[in-house]
Amino acid sequence: MGRAVKVLQLFKTLHRTRQQVFKNDARALEAARIKINEEFKNNKSETSSKKIEELMKIGSDVELLLRTSVIQGIHTDHNTLKLVPRKDLLVENVPYCDAPTQKQ
C-alpha cells in the first residue's frame, strides 16, 4: 500500500474516531476537526520518509488515545456531571488479587 493511501486512511480514521468520541458535542467536534486538518495541512509538503513515519506513529497513537481514554461528561445540574462511556471504554471488571497462587 502506498504512503499516500496510508496517510489518507489515518486522516479518515482520525475523523471517524473524532465523530464517535465527541458525539453530540458541537464545540469539541469542531475543535478536533480544525486541529486534525491543521496538522495534516502543516505537514503536507513533508518528503522525509523517516519524518512521515514518525508523524504517522503520532497520529495513530492519538487515535488510540482518543478511542480508549476519552469519556464524555454531560452537565445535568449545577454540580452534577453524567458520564457517557462508549463500548470501547468498557472492560471486564476482574478483581485484582495480590496474593501469589499456591501450587497444588
Curated annotation (Swiss-Prot):
<dbReference type="GO" id="GO:0045333">
    <property type="term" value="P:cellular respiration"/>
</dbReference>
<keyword id="KW-0225">Disease variant</keyword>
<dbReference type="InterPro" id="IPR050435">
    <property type="entry name" value="MZM1/LYRM7"/>
</dbReference>
<feature type="modified residue" description="Phosphoserine">
    <location>
        <position position="60"/>
    </location>
</feature>
<comment type="similarity">
    <text>Belongs to the complex I LYR family.</text>
</comment>
<comment type="function">
    <text>Assembly factor required for Rieske Fe-S protein UQCRFS1 incorporation into the cytochrome b-c1 (CIII) complex. Functions as a chaperone, binding to this subunit within the mitochondrial matrix and stabilizing it prior to its translocation and insertion into the late CIII dimeric intermediate within the mitochondrial inner membrane.</text>
</comment>
<keyword id="KW-1274">Primary mitochondrial disease</keyword>
<dbReference type="GO" id="GO:0044183">
    <property type="term" value="F:protein folding chaperone"/>
</dbReference>
<dbReference type="GO" id="GO:0031966">
    <property type="term" value="C:mitochondrial membrane"/>
</dbReference>
<keyword id="KW-0496">Mitochondrion</keyword>
<dbReference type="GO" id="GO:0005739">
    <property type="term" value="C:mitochondrion"/>
</dbReference>
<keyword id="KW-0597">Phosphoprotein</keyword>
<dbReference type="InterPro" id="IPR008011">
    <property type="entry name" value="Complex1_LYR_dom"/>
</dbReference>
<protein>
    <recommendedName>
        <fullName>Complex III assembly factor LYRM7</fullName>
    </recommendedName>
</protein>
<dbReference type="GO" id="GO:0034551">
    <property type="term" value="P:mitochondrial respiratory chain complex III assembly"/>
</dbReference>
<dbReference type="Pfam" id="PF05347">
    <property type="entry name" value="Complex1_LYR"/>
</dbReference>
<keyword id="KW-0143">Chaperone</keyword>
<comment type="subunit">
    <text>Interacts with UQCRFS1.</text>
</comment>
<dbReference type="InterPro" id="IPR045298">
    <property type="entry name" value="Complex1_LYR_LYRM7"/>
</dbReference>
<dbReference type="GO" id="GO:0005759">
    <property type="term" value="C:mitochondrial matrix"/>
</dbReference>
